[in-house]
């Protein structure tokens, strides 16, 4: 049995018969009153995100989660097929479980999949990925109504904001947590 002091990002809790993945947490010790833990967590089955506050030191039940490296192979309709890099077994993961990770996944890319009792719970991507710009309008230096960014579509079909100097065919580094542009990548 763990306590709320053991909560960190990626922890999976069992609450009211449901599994919840901790997305964000913050231990708070106010000057007056008892300490508490503020969390943002996602229901593993429904995908619903809720904010919940726990008293510090409260006993909680955590789920045993196995995290393994998998290679993304291909998309099969709404599902995604991954291969375990250790024993070469293939697993199929639903599009709902993969979620927004599809915006940053390329074939043969390595990802980390959290599995509980044989069921994939969620996909963990690396903090950043390198993607190629497949479409963007030419950016004119004097044509500015904002801070000098323009929309660009990457090879996965996801649209990001890039600086005006980025052109079609450029490889860029993208933050997988929020989809923001991190910089150009030189080959």
From Swiss-Prot:
Pathway-wise, it operates in: Protein biosynthesis; polypeptide chain elongation
Q: This chain belongs to which protein, by name? A: Elongation factor P
Question: Origin organism of this chain?
Answer: Paenarthrobacter aurescens (strain TC1)
PROSITE patterns, sorted: EFP
Query: What is the similarity comment for this entry?
Result: Belongs to the elongation factor P family.
Tell me the superkingdom of the source: Bacteria
Which PANTHER family does the UniProt record give?
ELONGATION FACTOR P (PTHR30053), ELONGATION FACTOR P (EF-P) FAMILY PROTEIN (PTHR30053:SF12)
Q: Which GO terms describe its biological process?
A: peptide biosynthetic process
